From Swiss-Prot:
GN (gene name): nrdR
ZnF (unnamed) residues: 3-34
Domain ATP-cone residue range list: 49-139
Keywords: ATP-binding, DNA-binding, Metal-binding, Nucleotide-binding, Repressor, Transcription, Transcription regulation, Zinc, Zinc-finger
Family recorded in the similarity comment: Belongs to the NrdR family.
NCBIfam families from the UniProt entry: transcriptional regulator NrdR
GO BP: negative regulation of DNA-templated transcription
Cofactor binding comment, as recorded: Binds 1 zinc ion.
PROSITE patterns: ATP_CONE
Lineage: Bacteria, Pseudomonadati, Pseudomonadota, Alphaproteobacteria, Rickettsiales
Protein name: Transcriptional repressor NrdR
Length: 151
């Protein structure tokens, strides 16, 4: 691994540990030339995930798009960035495991809703309002009633 500070290739691993989701390894490294320390993350690369859109088109899965939508739904809620990152990582690994790796966008939306329901009910309702294209107050009251039944 090349040192990001001096570009030397003489580096050594000082500490390794698996991530919380056990799908990556975090390594603490030290440069033997300049003695700088830096961290790397090693992840398993699986086949790329493709998303089948509602209009029939297929596009590459965009992890950043998913992250942005969840951050927007959880804005000003008691949800940490670490929790959001964990949701996105877990979803990404589940999607990679699907055979064929062409996943309908509805499956991804359902996975987000399921994750947000477990994480924060208000965030779940916010996401659902956009994902399910709510058009009036009755749509909101219907989903709020369903959430209250579970709680």
């Amino acid at each position: 691994m090349r040192c990001p500070f001096c570009n030397s290739v003489d580096t050594s691993v000082k500490n390794s540990r698996p991530s919380d989701c056990k799908m990556s390894v975090r390594r603490r490294r030290s440069c033997d030339s300049c003695n700088s320390r830096f961290t790397t993350v090693e992840e398993l690369l699986l086949k790329p995930v493709k998303v089948l859109k509602k209009d029939g088109s297929v596009e590459a899965f965009d992890r950043q798009k998913l992250l942005t939508s969840i951050i927007l739904a959880t804005k000003k809620r008691p949800v940490t960035r670490d929790q959001i990152d964990m949701v996105v990582s877990n979803m990404f690994y589940k999607l990679e495991a699907i055979k064929g790796s062409v996943v309908p966008s509805g499956v991804i939306g359902g996975m987000v809703m399921e994750s947000l329901f477990a994480l924060d009910k208000v965030s779940y309702i916010r996401f659902a309002s956009v994902y399910m294209n709510f058009s009036d107050v009755n749509d909101f009251s219907g989903i709020v009633e369903r959430v209250q039944e579970v709680v």
